[in-house]
Amino acid sequence: MVVRAYALGIFPMAPARGSPTVHWVAPAMRGILPLDRFHVPSRLRRTLRQHRYEIRCDSDFRAVIEACARPRPGHPETWINPAIKRVFCELHAAGHAHTVEVWHEGRLAGGLYGLALGGAFFGESMFSHATDASKIALAHLVARLRRGRFRLLDAQFLTEHLQQFGAIEVPSADYLTLLGEALRADAIFYGALPPDEESAAISELLTQSSTHRS
């Protein structure tokens, strides 16, 4: 049911993290991050080149979604309730939901999770316990999606935070067209990448971002 809803452009949100209710949402305007025009801000560009963090995928899905569900400064409430956590853990076990995790000195410093269907990736939420950790996770997600021939990165809603990376807003009808094309694409979500491929994917992303910016 949940996978089918996403394929139709609908996603679940709870009114609050402690709520037993889940609403199904289909915004009139949809936020997306164009994979071929992803912008890497200057400070994040420097951080990515320093390789100070270890990047993992799907090593601790539950820890990531639990961290995303917790209140944080400026955001005392979240929309991830127990039902959503349970469903996404099941989707992860089935191979549909994934994490990109940023680790530092053996600790989970930040990350994100989302759902992969065909060539569409639906970004759900991210968190950060260290400076720029969630941004690093996002950059590594985009690098992986580009390498895996994904066509769409759905951000659900356009936010000021995402706009710095090139996020845009499109009408629902246009989004559904993009979604249909993406679902038919032959794409692969790459989890663990060899260090040289990881570096190459990030280098390609930084080069593309620099070219697009200029």
Please annotate each region the language model reported.
Residues M1-S214:
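N-acyltransferase acceptor-side catalytic subdomain
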